[in-house]
From Swiss-Prot:
GO terms for cellular component: cytosol. Homodimer. The keyword Lyase applies. This is Orotidine 5'-phosphate decarboxylase. The gene is pyrF. It comes from Cereibacter sphaeroides (strain ATCC 17023 / DSM 158 / JCM 6121 / CCUG 31486 / LMG 2827 / NBRC 12203 / NCIMB 8253 / ATH 2.4.1.). Belongs to the OMP decarboxylase family. Type 1 subfamily.
Amino acid sequence: MADDRLIVALDVPNVVQGLDLAERLGDAVSFYKIGLGMLTGGGLALANELKQERGKRIFLDMKLFDIGATVEAAVRGFASYDLDFLTVHGDPQVVRAAVQGASGSGLRILAVTVLTSLDRADLDANMIRAGDLAEITLERAARALDAGAHGVIASPQEAAAIRALPQAAGRLIVTPGVRPTGAALGDQKRVATPARAIADGADHIVVGRPIWQAGDPRAAALAVQAELPTRG
């Protein structure tokens, strides 16, 4: 049985390629992430096919960021697709609106803290306040959780510190920026292995290219799951 702690990112351009990859992965994967790049290529149709016809769990990675009323309405629309996770940016007003939009459904709202493709130099270049990157991530996580987020998206390097927050009890930590042992970093800068991410408190890890670019994606997915610690 697939380990649902692994979420495979379907970072492919259209539904046909997404379904082809899901077919190749078969029962080795039970949880998929569909991102913004796929949305115009039929992402919601793909989500519906995987969820309703194949029994997979779906994480829609939209990183919504707008005024509260707009976010609430958008989330209410997404909730009608019976999704599992949806991302918003971690501004408290956005989080509160998203949680309200998801009320009455099983959709969990995850707040983005600091993208795993960014480092301190990137924050400086974008004039984001000075400070330790881990400290900024922790502050953003705490604010989002205080606003009612069901969980946060953060680098595996910050997972342990977030898990130690009082607000994080019973909340989800989902970590992109996870690379299997020996895999190339790609565009990720703050990374860890699957084993390290889970050991440090992540509930789910997100892995994309190391799986879907592999010659045998199914074997690659199973290899990632083999790196995960045994469930306690």
